[in-house]
Curated annotation (Swiss-Prot):
Superkingdom of the organism of origin: Bacteria
Family: Belongs to the aldehyde dehydrogenase family. IolA subfamily.
HAMAP family: IolA
Gene: iolA
Name listed for the protein in its UniProt record: Malonate-semialdehyde dehydrogenase
Length: 487
């Protein structure tokens, strides 16, 4: 048997062994194959990374902005040239199909492209005359060393929300990727080095609780970007804030999709199938609940079940596969327990994903419940799996009222051809990202990823102008220039 490779941390431009003696298997969720082992690093590893990032900040923060932008542009080109390999790594580690993985790579590259616009993004503003012979100007500066804590479900896109922008704006960065998907991060670091990034500007420390707490508590780390579950996100926000850091924590979701009687049924069902079961439902923008008007409900449910039955389940590397595995055995068991809870609490199970499980991987098939009510566990909790709940409603107002009862408010979608309904939905739904006649309302890089309520803790969101404000601080200079006598 070949020896299993042990991954290293990437600190100060070098691949270095962790100080730990603890390693965790990195498993292909479609085959249960152990691909490598990732170190569960120590606070000593974090300390070394912070020291390296702090030293690098002294020169990187003063590097000319166009020079930083050129390195980001080089990085974008290298990512584009290696997109097939990046997608393959995502599928091997995460399980999503190749098409979805390529889409994720594209969204990650999009964020690098946006970050490469640093010369424009870093611009301040000025007022030539605020009083006699007095002018004022506002300048942006990087804030220092930034920490990022990323999840397993989007191992490229989510880190690319964080480190390209932070680095382009003059900060240095320490990334803790998910210990379940570290191989993609290894490739991201290799390509960034090839792009010409100086040592210490970007660092990767693998691990779990000790690394997270080390990042949250270290006085030389000035800001934290986090994406993950609500309980962990709330902890990160509180702990980081306690240590006087800027924190943005993007957390859980229970996204509702509303289908009105005038919706184009075929397109609506196709969109919802993709939104509910794409990426095995393991995404914070997944459609978790459909509220459908009674007039179209029976026809909608028939088409939904028909399309769900046609979904091909399997290894994401295989041709034609739509639905890959969930990430681990524990996630599979947790999903099964939610299915059992839904049945126990009175929901009607129309498609049972347990029937599609195989011994080869952590597979759960598309699962659909009808006649769900808001007192049921499957409506309340974020399941993070290919499980869809359907509620039948009398009208749009009832659908919006139901969605607004959720503690989460990440995204919401509406399918209709009625302009008045769209306006009512936009003005009354409690959610930060809305979709009209589309299933996944995730914005592009130049708009903020803006969840509400328990879907976000902080003030400045990821992406868009919010990210520029989050990773910079401002200095206002007011100057008096007495009028000279040129006569």
């Amino acid at each position: 048997m070949a020896e299993i490779r042990k991954l290293k941390n990437y600190i100060n431009g070098e691949w270095v062994e962790s100080k730990t003696d603890q390693y965790e298997d990195v498993i292909n969720p479609a085959t249960k194959e152990v691909m490598c082992q990732v170190p569960i690093s120590t606070r000593e590893d974090v300390e070394y990374a912070v020291r390296s990032a702090s030293e690098a900040f002294q020169t990187w923060s003063k590097t000319a902005v166009p020079r930083r932008a050129r390195i980001l542009f080089n990085y974008q080109q290298l990512l584009q040239q290696n997109k097939e390999e990046l997608a393959r790594l995502i599928t091997l580690e995460n399980g999503k199909n190749t098409t979805e993985a390529l889409g994720e790579v594209g969204r990650g590259i999009e964020n690098v492209e946006f970050a490469a616009g640093a010369p424009s993004l870093m611009m301040g503003d000025s007022l030539a005359s605020i009083a006699t012979d007095v002018e004022a100007a506002n300048y942006r500066y990087p804030i220092g060393v930034v920490g990022g804590i990323a999840p397993f479900n989007f191992p490229m896109m989510v880190p690319c929300w964080m480190f390209p922008m932070a680095i382009s704006l003059g900060n240095t960065f320490i990334l803790k990727p998910s210990e379940r998907t570290p191989l993609l991060t290894e490739k991201l670091a290799e390509l960034f080095e090839q792009a010409g990034l100086p040592k210490g500007v970007f660092n990767v420390v693998h691990g779990a609780h000790d690394v997270v707490n080390g990042v949250l508590e270290h006085p030389d780390i000035k800001a934290i970007s986090f994406v993950g579950s609500k309980p962990v996100g709330e902890y990160v926000f509180k702990k980081g804030s306690e240590h006087l850091k800027r924190v943005q924590a993007l957390t859980g979701a229970k996204n509702h999709t509303i289908v009105l009687n005038d919706a184009h049924l075929e397109d609506t069902v196709t969109n919802i199938i993709g939104a509910a079961f794409g990426s095995a439902g393991e995404r914070c923008m997944a459609c978790a609940v459909v509220t459908v008007e009674e007039g179209i409900a029976d026809e909608f449910m028939a088409k939904l079940q028909e399309k769900a039955a046609d979904i091909k389940i399997g290894n994401g590397l295989d041709d034609g596969v739509f639905l890959g595995p969930v990430i681990r055995e524990d996630n599979k068991k947790r999903t099964h327990s939610y299915i059992e809870k839904g049945i126990e609490e009175g929901a009607r199970l129309l498609c049972d994903g347990r029937e599609n499980a195989t011994e080869d991987g952590y597979f759960v098939g598309p699962t659909i419940f009808d006649n769900v009510t808001t007192d049921m566990t499957i409506w309340k909790d974020e399941i993070f799996a290919p499980v869809l709940s359907v509620i039948r409603v009398k009208n749009l107002k009832e659908a919006v009222d139901i969605a607004n009862q959720s503690e989460f408010a990440n995204g919401a979608c509406l399918f209709t051809s009625n302009a008045n309904a769209i306006r009512y939905f936009r003005e009354n739904i409690d959610a930060g990202m809305l979709g009209i006649n589309l299933g996944v309302p995730a914005p592009m890089a130049f708009f903020p990823f803006s969840g509400w309520k328990s879907s976000f803790f902080g003030t400045l969101h990821a992406n868009g102008k919010d990210s520029v404000d989050f990773y910079t601080r401002k200095k206002v200079v007011t100057a008096r220039y007495p009028s000279p006598d040129f006569n």
